């Protein structure tokens, strides 16, 4: 019988510019910080199993973005759901917690927010862990993305309805978790039930449509992110679910174009790689972070 004590995870809320930002926190506050930024359509819930694995050595913080999880979700008329604005809220969140430097785990929309944060404050970023989050257009699976690209081209009710009829339904949310996994019986239904319950709140589908549409602006931001990679050469660990139906393996490999020393691991799983590969990813992160930001 193991005597290992599992680190305690705290569930807190912080007021940031009038928004109640929910976050999970664990580990010693005087240790190096690891900031976990979640993807669509999830929340910090996606990190529930990873946080205790890192909190023995690291100060781990995982916020819910506005519009997700337990954080405030003001209407699209009352809040700008652009990635630029979400990055600023995340910036203010870290500053209010007096976090002056951090490694970032970036997945899906978390990458779009985190890379903006890195460009804003390169001096604060100690390392990057990228898991199925894109910084190159080639990363998009063209079949999956057709409806999204059509919406970017023409923000019509017809094109919005295509997204509403599948991507933002329980079937679409469930697909995010099950597509490409080795063993669906290992994936808890809690994932898509919780995510869909959040999306089904009044006004939240409008929020998601706004965030999906505003992802179009990432195309113009890629050059800035790639220049940041080339100039700053941040340590990067890439742990990528190679069976993802949203972002391709090419999207993972392209990071090495700007960051030849990036460490790439292709894992036999889908978009939410932590669901099947949390032990592997946690182990890789520990080894990587111990070597790059916690050398003492």
Predicted regions and their residues:
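Structural cue for short, hydrophobic secondary-structure segments
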Residues: 36-39, 62
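Active-site glycine-rich loops that stabilize anionic/oxyanionic intermediates
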Residues: 39-42, 108
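Alpha/beta-hydrolase active-site loop signature
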Residues: 41, 66-69, 135, 270-273
């Amino acid at each position: 019988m193991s005597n290992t004590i599992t680190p305690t995870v705290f569930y807190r809320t912080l007021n940031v510019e009038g928004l109640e930002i929910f976050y999970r926190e664990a580990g010693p506050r005087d240790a190096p910080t690891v900031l976990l930024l979640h993807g669509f359509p999830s929340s910090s819930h996606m990190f529930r199993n990873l946080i205790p694995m890192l909190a023995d050595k690291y100060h781990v913080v995982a916020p819910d973005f506005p519009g997700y999880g337990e954080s405030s979700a003001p209407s699209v008329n009352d809040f700008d759901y652009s990635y630029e604005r979400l990055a600023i809220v995340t910036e203010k969140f870290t500053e209010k917690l007096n976090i002056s430097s951090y490694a970032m785990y970036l997945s899906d929309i978390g990458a779009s927010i985190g890379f903006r944060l890195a460009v804003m404050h390169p001096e604060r970023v100690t390392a990057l862990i990228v898991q199925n989050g894109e910084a190159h257009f080639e990363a998009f699976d063209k079949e999956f993305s057709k409806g999204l690209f059509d919406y970017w081209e023409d923000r019509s009710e017809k094109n919005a309805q295509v997204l509403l009829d599948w991507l933002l339904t329980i079937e679409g949310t469930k697909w995010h978790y099950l597509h490409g996994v080795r063993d669906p019986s290992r994936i808890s239904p809690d994932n898509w039930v919780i995510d869909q319950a959040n999306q089904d709140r009044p006004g939240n589908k409008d929020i998601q449509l706004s965030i999906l549409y505003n992802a179009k602006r990432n195309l113009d931001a890629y050059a800035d992110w790639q220049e940041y990679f080339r100039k700053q050469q941040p340590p990067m660990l890439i742990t990528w679910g190679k069976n993802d139906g949203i972002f391709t393996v090419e999207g993972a490999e392209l990071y090495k174009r700007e960051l030849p020393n990036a460490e790439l691991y292709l894992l036999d799983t889908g978009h939410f790689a932590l669901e099947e590969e949390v032990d592997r990813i946690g182990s890789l992160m520990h080894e990587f972070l111990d070597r790059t930001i916690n050398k003492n």
